[in-house]
Amino acid sequence: MQSERTFIDGKVDGVSRTYHSNGKVETEKVYKLGIEDGYDRRYGSDGTLTLDECYKDGKRDGKWTQHLSSNLGDMVRISFYKNGLPDGQWSETWKDGKPRSKSSYKDGKKEGVWIRYGKGGKPEKSTTYKNDEKNGEEITYFTDGTPEKSSNYLNGKLNGVTKEFYFESGKCKSEYTFKNGQREGAYKRYFDTGELREEGCCEADSEVYRKEYYANGKLKSVAERKGGGWNTIERYDSEGNKE
C-alpha cells in the first residue's frame, strides 16, 4: 500500500493519504501535530466515497456519512457527533431512498423518538427515549404499518396501559396495566369483533381473578387463582344459565 504523509517535529501533520494498488486514493485524513483534526475519508478502489468523517482535537465531531452493505441491502447512515459523543439526529436510508431508521442523541444519550422501518418503508417499531431510557410510548407495527402493540414506559420500565391489536380488524386484542414493569390491576381481552372475551385483575405480574365471556356477551365463568391453579367459582352456558 502506497502512502504519503507530512511530519512536523516527528508528528504527522496535514493531509495523510494511502492508495489502492490501482493508484486511486484509499484514505485521506487530516492531522494536526499527530492528532486527527479535520476530515477522515475512505474510498473504494473505483473512487467511490464510502466514509466521510470529521474529527476535532482527536474526537469525533460534526457530520459523519457512512455507506454500508448488508445481506438486506445497501444503505447510507448519517450521524452527528459533538465532543466525541453522539449528538443530534441520525438516520439510515436504503439505496432506493426509503428510510431504514431515524434516531436522536443528546450528549451521547438516546433522546426523543426512535423509529425503525421495514424494507418497504413501513414502520416496524417506534420508541420514545429520555436520558438514555425508554420514557413514553413504544409501538410495534404489523408489516402493513398498522399498530400491533402499544406500551408506555417510565424510566425504562413498563408503566401504564399496554395494548395489543388484531391484524385483520385492527381492534384491541388485550389491555393490561403495568406498574414498575409488572402487571398490576385490571386487564381485559377481546374477541376480534371487539366484544369482551375476558376481564380480571393482576397482582405482582400474575392474573389472580378473571371473568370469561361468550362471543354473544353472556358470562361464561368466574374464577380465582389459588395455590398455583385456577379455581372456578361459577360457570354458565351460552344462554346465561348457571351450570
Where are these regions (language model features)?
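Glycine/tyrosine- and acidic-biased, solvent-exposed loop/turn segments at the edges of beta-strands
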Residues: 1-243
